[in-house]
Every structure is written in structure tokens, then in C-alpha cells.
Amino acid sequence: MKSKPAIRRILATLERLYPHDDTCFLNYDHAHPWQLLFATILSAQCTDARVNIVTPALFSQFPTLEAFAAANITDIEKAIRSTGFYRAKAGHLQQSARLLLANHGGQLPSDIENLTALSGVGRKTANVVRGHIFDIPSITVDTHVMRISRKLGLTANTCPVKIEFDLMEQLPKKHWIAYNQQIISHGRAICTARSPKCENCELKKECEEYKCKIQPKAH
């Protein structure tokens, strides 16, 4: 676990590099918040960029939950094929539409329990919805948050749920949503999975991996 001064330095650096706003990386119509849920389901094992290419046509073809619920499943599959795992995802979209209509009057629930009861929705997807739709402080553990949080010494766990709770324990609640966005931005720009730009990283002094593996090689 990280010291409080180190955490303050990390958060201050992230805020300076990536000033927080509430813009979601996934595009959706704010008048139809269920679209963010569906876009996040599609983002599993797929890039946000690809999802943002697919969803405009998808939501034009199926503009309502009722349209998804009544659709021929093969039509949904065709529309989302390029996102990968399209058969499973199509089933999740249709079943979630039906559950939202049957159990929630077509409205998104805000609590973890009801969100994760929807088809294809785990804590990551639920927390995206909670943070962006309901402005509820939430930690979203995607691959960037998992990788970089471990490097920074904020967690030693590999289980996303355990990482989520490690971060919740250490980070001030007011920073939770911003941390998600900022770490994802940092993971895309600097701390990439395959070829991290360690020498250009302004977090390297706080990075346990850099201290252990990179610095000794320079001596």
C-alpha cells in the first residue's frame, strides 16, 4: 500500500497532466442513458474507438429498449460483429433490454446489485454507469487501471474486484471517477502495455516497477 503523501503526489500529477472532465470515452445519447450500458457491454475485449464506430448505426437501427427486446438476434449480431464475441454480446444486449423493461420500467437502476443482475454486466460495467450516469463515486477497474495501479504500488492484487476495493480504501472518494479517466488516458499515452515510455513518465518516481527493474539497469 502507498503512503498518503505518495498518493497525493500521484493524484496531483494526474490532475496536472489530464485535467479532469466528465466526458466519457464511450459515446452515447445522454437522453438515453441505457446506451452507455450497452456500449460498455460491447467494450469488453474491444477498444472504445471500435465501439464508437459501431454504436451510431446500432442505436439508429435499434433506437429503443423495445427494439432490442423484439429484434431478431441475428440482426443484432450483424450490427456488432466487429466488436468481437458478437454472439454472446448480442444475447447480453437483448436480455438486458428485456430485464430493464420487465423489472425497472425501462430505467437504469443505480445500485450495484440490480446493475450486475443484468445480462453481461459485471462490476466494471456497473461502475461506469454509476459514475457517468448517476455521478456516484465509483472505481472502474479496466486493463489500464489494473496494470498501472499495480505498478504504482497501490495494489498487489490481480483480481479486479480486490483491486477495486484496494483503491477505494486508499484514494479519496472525490477522486475516484477522475482517477479512472486519468489512468486510462495515461495508459494510452505513456504507460502502454507493450512499450511503456518510462523515461517520459512523470509518475516514474512513484512507480515501483520503474524503481525495481529500470533504474538498477542504469548503474
Q: What do the PLM-derived regions correspond to, one by one?
A:
Residues K2-A218:
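Catalytic cores of DNA base-excision repair glycosylases
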